[in-house]
Structures are given as C-alpha cells and as structure tokens.
C-alpha cells in the first residue's frame, strides 16, 4: 500500500479573548484562520502489531513518544473505535513548536480527518467531540482548515471565501509554555463573538481586535515586545498580533510586495529569528 500525503496547515489566532474559567480550563473565544505554512504527513496502513510514528525536519528535535498523534491512536483504541488497523506515519515538521501555531494539534486533527474519510473509524458527533477534547483544545478547529469563529461556549462557526491576507510569521529562538502564559491571566472580557458574521474577517475589523494573552507574553519576554514594535514600525499598512500564547508574532498585509519588503528588513535586524512569508487559505 502506498502512502497518502496530507498537508497539515498552521493555525493562527487573528484575535483571542479570555471570557472566563471553568474548574480546569480557561474559556476563550477566537477569530481563527489557517495559513499556507504546513507540515507534511505521509500515512499508510501496515501489517504490524503497533503503529510506527516518526518525525523529521528542523522542528522535530524535541518531539517524544508521547505526542498528539500517539495520544490520538491511544484514545481511539481505548474507546474501541479503532480495533485492528495499524498505521505507519511520517511527519515532516515545518511548523515551529511552542509558537501558538498549533502544529501538533493540527497533525492529530488531519490524521483524525483522514481516518474518518477512509472509513477506518466512524465516530458519532459526541464521540468526535470527546476525541478532540482528549488531545487538545485546538484539535476541533483543525477538522476543517478554514476561517472560523470559536465562540465562548465552544461552538464553532465556519466561513468560506473570506478575503485572504499575506502574512509574515516570526518566531524567536525560544517558545512560550501555554500553561505558563495562561497562569498569568488575571481578568476576563465579556464575550464579543457570540454573533459571528463574515464581516468580522475584514482587515479593518480585525485591526481593531486583540489577543488577551499578548500582554502577558510580552511582559514575560521583552524580546517579543521589541519584535512586535519593529514590525509595527516597518509598515503602517499592516497590523501585528501574537497568535495563541506565542511565541510567534504575525504581521498581516494586503500587499504581498509590502510583506516581502518587511521580511527583508526583519531578517537583516533579527538574524537569529525564524521568519516565513505565507498566505491565509
């Protein structure tokens, strides 16, 4: 059997608000998009007693045996949704970890989507929600890589054919611990995205929004503050925002030329930072 090839796109939070907290998790609402930056997953069914999962690429170094993909298969087998089939999976990692780009969660989401599409598993809606929750809060968002509003009650509303943006994604040599950044949350905002509409994805509207976690990450890591300030100074025709809990910062542009120009300036100034031009999908 030959490998199936899957593109696992990076997730970006164009805006994010913390609206409260349950006993375990913070309640969030977010404007979510996906960009052309992606990991490449090769998957095929094999005759074996166990799954074979391997990672390669620049951002594969610290991925251990307990990862989102192994967690997915463990849960599917525990719930007897996947009983006898075993798979070999090779992941080429292009999305940096601990960046707020959801690389690991999107890998699990795309493999889950593949298993459903190829009829290896057939979960009902309740089971699907349970699978996603068992792996990570972003996984449900990755089942359809499109512009999405995540409401504070965890409901997801998807939007097709939204205006696309050019983006410059930058990440310093360090990452942010999601747990650590969320532990710094001291106040909540009222839900603002409970009536989602396509106009929320307009450039002018997005410019007015923010990411509630950004101030915490920027305070903890002054270098992030400097990076954001540099990107904002480089162009007044863009807006700049951290994605997720960081440490990646994204600059949004209408013009590809402007995006490329700012990348050149940034690369000259911050030689040790990773940066990538991409586009929303």
Task: Show which residues each predicted segment covers.
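Contiguous, small/hydrophobic- and glycine-enriched helical/loop subdomains that border
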Residues: 112-152
């Amino acid at each position: 059997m030959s490998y199936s090839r899957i593109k696992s796109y990076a997730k970006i939070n164009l805006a994010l608000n913390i609206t409260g907290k349950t006993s375990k998790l913070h309640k969030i609402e977010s404007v979510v998009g996906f960009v052309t930056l992606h990991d490449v997953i090769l998957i095929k069914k094999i005759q074996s007693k166990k799954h074979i999962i391997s990672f390669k690429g620049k951002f594969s170094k610290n991925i251990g045996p307990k990862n989102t993909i192994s967690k997915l298969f463990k849960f599917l087998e525990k719930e007897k949704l996947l009983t006898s089939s075993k798979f070999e999976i090779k992941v080429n990692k292009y999305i940096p970890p601990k960046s707020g780009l959801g690389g690991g969660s999107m890998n699990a989401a795309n493999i889950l989507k593949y298993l459903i599409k190829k009829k290896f598993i057939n979960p009902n809606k309740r089971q699907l929600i349970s699978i996603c929750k068992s792996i990570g809060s972003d996984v449900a968002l990755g089942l359809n890589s499109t512009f999405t509003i995540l409401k504070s009650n965890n409901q997801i509303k998807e939007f097709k054919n939204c205006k696309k943006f050019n983006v410059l994604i930058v990440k310093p040599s360090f990452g942010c611990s999601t747990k650590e950044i969320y532990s710094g949350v001291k106040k909540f905002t009222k839900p603002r995205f409970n009536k989602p509409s396509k106009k929320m994805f307009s450039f002018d509207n997005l410019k007015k929004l923010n990411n509630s976690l950004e101030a915490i990450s920027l305070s903890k890591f002054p270098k992030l503050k400097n990076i954001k300030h540099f990107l904002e100074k480089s162009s007044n025709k863009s807006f700049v925002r951290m994605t997720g809990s960081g440490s990646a910062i994204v600059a949004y542009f209408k013009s590809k030329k402007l995006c490329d120009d700012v990348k050149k300036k940034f690369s000259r100034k911050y030689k040790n930072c990773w940066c990538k031009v991409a586009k929303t999908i």
